[in-house]
């Protein structure tokens, strides 16, 4: 079994600590105003180009599973995603602006594949906001990683 420490998930805990109440308030208001997307709704490493995106990027489906299993990060991601799913805003763009609306789609695509629970907020978010369509680039990166790991065996 993989431990949380194998992926340095503490980097997310540390980043969220001073802003998490602000995150909740902004999501509940339906309008993100401050800078926390990378460490609240992480996406696969390789999608973002900035050093911050690389630092907070999720390295693999295994790291995504460890994130969900983390006693603080998993429940926080679940809660934040549920708030977005039930938002009365007109679109992801209205909630997050650009490019964070695309980052959210990438995030929920990744985590919808990382959980065995078919009734999860990530799938609900894809259905509510993305017409059920996952982020294609996330799928490509995951498929490339899967093929690469098979070739190494």
Write out the residue ranges for each language-model feature:
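Extreme N-terminal tail/first-helix region
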Residues: 1-21, 143-147
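Short amphipathic alpha-helical segments and their helix-coil junctions
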Residues: 13-26, 84-92
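C-terminal end-helix/capping segment
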Residues: 57-76, 129, 136-137
């Amino acid at each position: 079994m993989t431990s949380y420490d194998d992926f340095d998930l503490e980097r997310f805990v540390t980043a969220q600590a001073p802003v998490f109440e602000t995150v909740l308030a902004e999501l509940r208001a339906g309008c993100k105003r401050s800078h926390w997307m990378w460490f609240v709704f992480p996406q696969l490493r390789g999608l973002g180009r900035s050093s911050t995106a690389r630092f907070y990027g999720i390295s693999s489906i295994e790291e995504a599973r460890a994130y969900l299993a983390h006693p603080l990060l998993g429940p926080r991601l679940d809660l934040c995603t549920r708030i977005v799913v039930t938002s009365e805003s007109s679109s992801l763009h209205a909630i997050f602006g650009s490019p964070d609306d695309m980052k959210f789609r990438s995030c929920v695509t990744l985590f919808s594949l990382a959980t065995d629970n078919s009734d999860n907020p990530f799938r609900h978010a894809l259905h509510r906001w993305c017409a059920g369509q996952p982020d294609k680039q996330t799928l490509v990166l995951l498929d490339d990683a899967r093929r690469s790991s098979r070739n190494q065996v």
